[in-house]
Structure formats: C-alpha cells, structure tokens
Amino acid sequence: MRKSNVILVALGFSVSSAVMAQQQRLPSDVYEVYVADKERIEREYKADKERCNSLDGNAEDICEAEAKGREEVAKAELEDKYRPSRESRYEVRMARAKADYRVAKERCDDLSGNVKDVCLEEAKAAQAAAIADAKKED
C-alpha cells in the first residue's frame, strides 16, 4: 500500500510540474509579438540615444536619463502585459520611480550650492515616496 501511495504522489508531482511548465511558456504567436515589442523598445532607445548625442553637457545627460528611463519602464510594462502578476506590476512602479529619480538627479546637476543640495534631497524624497507607494499597492 505504501509503495502505491509513493507512486501516486510522484505521479501527482510530475503532472503538476508539467502543467506549471506549460503555463510559464507563451504560445508561439504571442511570443513572436512579445519579441517584436521588445525589439521595438530597443530600437526606440537607440534612436533616443542618438538624438541625445546631438546635445552637449548636462542636457545630454538629462536626455540620456530620460531615454534610459523610458526604455526600462517600457520593458517592465511589456513584461507585465505578457506575464501579469503582482510582482510585474510592482516592477513597473519601481522602474518608474527609478527613472524619475535618475532624471531629477540629472536636472539637479545644473544647479549649484545649497539649491543643488535641496534639489537632490527633494529628488530622494520623491523617490522614497514612490518606492513606498509601489510597495503598498496591490
């Protein structure tokens, strides 16, 4: 009797593992759209980066931070679109918070002295608030 129970349990695990593995994969047509969307995001990032190269100084840094932020948020949104979950929604919110902070920090670089320090503190506070909001949602 024990041997048959062990066999049934092992069979149950293998079937549930196969079902879970099947759920993790995207159908081929959906996967092709996913890959195309991912490639589009990468092309847009490269084009944005090329536009940034025409700028100088901190304007270029701000432009690059904005481009990188758009790319990271778009990739996180893509993952959430094709594999929706609490974790993927959290990753979208975190990507937005990080992107906003990166841009705000670059904008503060144009300033100097106490004004720059205040700007950086405000950027950090905004990021902390965005992260806290991301953690409490869902």
Q: What residue ranges belong to the model's regions?
A:
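Bacterial N-terminal signal peptides that target proteins for export
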Residues: 1-7
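Mitochondrial intermembrane space
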Residues: 18-138
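Bacterial N-terminal signal peptides
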Residues: 8-16
